Amino acid sequence: MDKIALKITFSAETPKYAQSVLTEYVNFVSQYSLNQTNQEFKQGFNLRLDELRFSKEQIEENLTEEKKVQVENLTNALDIAKKAGIKDFSRGNNISDSKLADGTYLFILAEKYLQAQLDIAKNTPVVYPANYYITDRQLFKLNKLASQLELVEDVKTYYYLSSPDYPVVKDNPKRSLILAIGFIIGILLPTFFILLGSVIQTNKKQS
């Protein structure tokens, strides 16, 4: 086994059976890989949906809470202005913007102004930022695609460099080995006898 491939070998009684086993194994691995890939993709897909939903809900909750606080501050300021008899705003009241911003001195703005602001705050719909609508569109599109995740069928996670096939004539490695050994012996034996005969003749002459 190397970094990018796994080599598997097996033997079978017939070439046809070997091809059948190979096909079944490849289909099994293909389906397993497809299931794993699909599962991982779904997890990432659903995680993205959750992130978008959370982002959208956070924007809605924050703006709703801001509007609620604004209405409460204006209502309280209006009640104080009514009790204090402050009908109209006087520019002589030198109140800084920072004091008005925290709601403590809003009553200085007087009853008429506060009532108008309160009516606007209650009746005006929440204005959402651009990223809210971008998030909403993404959610809409992804939700339409979600139903199609279950429609993945007949997908192959592999392709053949060449189609698998089996030989017409069955391979016989034992027969080939025997023939090779016989060929080698056929060459060596005559050579051995020739050398042996030569040695015997030489010994006779010397005697």
Curated annotation (Swiss-Prot):
The keyword Transmembrane applies. One of its GO terms (cellular component) is membrane. Its main location: membrane. It is found in: Membrane. Keywords: Membrane, Transmembrane, Transmembrane helix. It is a single-pass membrane protein. The chain crosses the membrane at residues 177-197. InterPro entries: Bact_polysacc_biosynth/exp. The keyword ATP-binding does not apply. This is Uncharacterized protein HI_0866. It comes from Haemophilus influenzae (strain ATCC 51907 / DSM 11121 / KW20 / Rd). The lineage of its organism: Bacteria, Pseudomonadati, Pseudomonadota, Gammaproteobacteria, Pasteurellales.
